[in-house]
Amino acid sequence: MDLAAVVLAAGRGTRMKSRRPKVLHRVAGRPMVGYVMEAVREAGANRIIVVAGYGHEEVAAVVNELGGEVVVQEPQLGTAHAVLQAEEKLADHRGQVLVVCGDTPLLRGETLSKLAVRHREADAAATVLTAFLDDPTGYGRVIRDAAGRFVRIVEQSDGTPEELAVREVSTGVFCFAAGGLFECLRRISPDNQQGEYYLPDALIVYLKNGLTVSTCPVEDPAEIYGINDRRQLAEVERLMRSAVLDYWMGEGVTVVDPASTYIDRAARIGRDTVIHPSSFIEGDSVIGEECEIGPNARLVRARLGDRVSVQYAVVLDSTIGERTTVGPFAYIRPGCEIGAGVKIGDFVEIKKSVVGNESKIPHLSYVGDAVIGEKVNVGAGTITCNYDGKKKWTTVIEDGAFIGSNTNLVAPVTVGRGAYVGAGSTIRRDVPPGALGVARSDQKNIPNWETRIRHEKKDNRQNNDK
């Protein structure tokens, strides 16, 4: 099947009240135009042309990364005019052309495949994807004759009361035979209240020339739900999120409270993992089997091995090995590689660091720009002092080292294999393997301090009373 697709994405989306092009607003972690491109590709489209307008450079950056091409519609004179902008790109195309809207992220590839099949079976010049809606407000109505044959599509602003009472609507999705399409579009006139060139008017041109226009109903009208404002964006997000959660529960993942769980479409989760309430799994995060996520966890582009626990914690752009526990109240910043069997405890922040297998950073520590070996113990209150005001420096803690509580490691510095650092130390020079490093002032005890303080307080009170 020689199938191309034109995605209409030129509108600014004024009701969104946003500087961002409408089709780049995200649903379940992806720009909505990405879902539409995925759907037409699943339907068999081997070439995807996206018609952009407002913010076309931003749109092109996303579309090109997803394997599509962009043409610019300027000025924006309607949907037929938009499709005409793809003429040069499709000059040699001889098959079929799908035309879809870039703001319908729930549209499925299976539905578009059925549309293309119906189009071929009917030997039609054009086929319209239609839907029956309880409230068709805002959609073009499908008008038929007494025999049920397609006659035309009437836009909301142009319809009579009788026409606007029709519940069958055009979804804005079409399949055209490429031959003659652009010639047909050039014959359309802007005879409507908006003064625009409407794509549905091409159907009238076809019918006047004795060509066939067929229709294909969509099974689930939710698929054609378009996004024009923030409320609709939230509703589509809800529908998409529900579908994603339903899929993963069907794949053996426990979601304790779907109402408070957010999983992006690109995420991957292993079986027997449990997702607790108020958890967010974003981007292309990958979670292994038998993990415990949450409650109150946020994972962004994270890679987790099997049997990892993340509770009340944030993990960003980092890798965590199997059997590791993170949290509560831990913060794993981008660029971290955490090994297997590691403990990252409460109020620990790690940034751009490597932590070896079976090491422990149990609580109240900052580890930045560090390389920590295997079976290292980092005591409470340990700080890697990695920044001198101009440059970030590396701290190295080799295998089996023991760092006492309340320690400052002033980078660049290395604590050797099996070495110890005494609690309360500020380490500025390397500690050799197997050695004990201690760097702190000697303790000084002042006798009778409590008695002295008590007398000073009494004298102060007497002076204040005078």
Curated annotation (Swiss-Prot):
It catalyses: alpha-D-glucosamine 1-phosphate + acetyl-CoA = N-acetyl-alpha-D-glucosamine 1-phosphate + CoA + H(+); N-acetyl-alpha-D-glucosamine 1-phosphate + UTP + H(+) = UDP-N-acetyl-alpha-D-glucosamine + diphosphate. The keyword Protease does not apply. Binds 1 Mg(2+) ion per subunit. Residues 231-251 are annotated as: Linker. It is found in: Cytoplasm. Keywords: Acyltransferase, Cell shape, Cell wall biogenesis/degradation, Cytoplasm, Magnesium, Metal-binding, Multifunctional enzyme, Nucleotidyltransferase, Peptidoglycan synthesis, Repeat, Transferase. Residues 252-466 are annotated as: N-acetyltransferase. Catalyzes the last two sequential reactions in the de novo biosynthetic pathway for UDP-N-acetylglucosamine (UDP-GlcNAc). The C-terminal domain catalyzes the transfer of acetyl group from acetyl coenzyme A to glucosamine-1-phosphate (GlcN-1-P) to produce N-acetylglucosamine-1-phosphate (GlcNAc-1-P), which is converted into UDP-GlcNAc by the transfer of uridine 5-monophosphate (from uridine 5-triphosphate), a reaction catalyzed by the N-terminal domain. In the N-terminal section; belongs to the N-acetylglucosamine-1-phosphate uridyltransferase family. NCBIfam families: glmU, PRK14354.1. This is Bifunctional protein GlmU. It comes from Desulforudis audaxviator (strain MP104C). The lineage of its organism: Bacteria, Bacillati, Bacillota, Clostridia, Thermoanaerobacterales.
